[in-house]
Structure formats: structure tokens, C-alpha cells
């Protein structure tokens, strides 16, 4: 099947639920849309999803992670107001201290009961699915 030059495809992304010190790591975004978010980002050409997840985690939190499992894929075309993205979410564990890097203003570890109010994208839904062990 030949695609025309005006054919648009969704953009692949990864997000990572990093388990650390009894909570999960979130970053406060420097760029729009504002709010707290799971570490993650765009998959670069030639990368595997797993490599992109470990790279994004390191860039945004300074943490070296160990991927535990692929959690779920989220594909609602409205999940990111900038583009139609499809994200594959991983669960990972890490040791050390999360520090804001790359496009993060802050990094923090949050318990289920103390998640921030303003969470970007569909990451509140993802976190709810994770904490309820939906997948």
C-alpha cells in the first residue's frame, strides 16, 4: 500500500510509571500543556519502545530505570491536545532521587492519596488504571 504525502499517522510515544520510595515519579512540565505528568515523550526514529522509555526517564528524571513490564497502550485521539499520539505505558522501578531535567520544572514522588490536582494529558486516567490494577 502506497501512502500519499498528505497521509497523517498518529505519533508514537512512551510514558513510564516509575515506582520509587513507595510512590510514583511525576514531573512538572516546563512546556504546554502545563501540569504534572508521567515521564515520557516521543519515540525517535530507529528506537525501540523500551529504549525510548529508558532514555526519556533518564532525560526527565535523572533516574536509571529497570523496566518491569509493558502496562497498557492508550490511543484516544484527544489524549494530547497538540497531536494525535498513541502511547505505550511501561511500569519501571528505580533507586535514587528524581531530579528535574530536560523539559521538567520539578520532579517528585507521589503516593496514590496525594497526587497533584493538575495532571496533564490523560495521565490521571493512566494512574487510576495503575492504582486500581486495571491492566
Q: What are the functions of these language-model segments?
A:
Residues 1-15, 130:
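Acidic, metal-coordinating catalytic segment for phosphate/diphosphate chemistry
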Residues 63-72:
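A short coil-to-beta-strand element that immediately follows conserved catalytic motifs
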Amino acid at each position: 500500500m502506497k501512502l500519499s504525502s498528505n497521509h497523517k499517522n498518529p505519533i508514537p510515544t512512551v510514558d513510564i510509571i516509575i515506582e520509587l520510595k513507595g510512590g510514583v515519579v511525576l514531573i512538572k512540565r516546563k512546556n504546554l500543556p502545563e501540569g504534572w505528568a508521567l515521564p515520557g515523550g516521543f519515540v525517535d526514529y530507529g528506537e525501540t519502545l523500551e529504549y525510548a522509555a529508558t532514555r526519556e526517564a533518564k532525560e526527565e528524571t535523572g533516574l536509571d530505570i529497570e523496566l518491569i513490564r509493558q502496562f497498557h497502550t492508550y490511543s484516544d485521539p484527544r489524549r494530547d491536545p497538540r497531536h494525535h499520539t498513541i502511547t505505550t505505558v511501561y511500569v519501571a522501578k528505580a533507586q535514587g532521587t528524581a531530579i528535574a531535567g530536560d523539559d521538567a520544572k520539578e520532579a517528585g514522588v507521589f503516593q496514590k492519596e496525594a497526587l497533584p490536582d493538575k495532571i496533564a494529558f490523560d495521565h490521571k486516567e493512566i494512574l487510576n488504571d495503575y492504582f486500581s490494577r486495571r491492566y
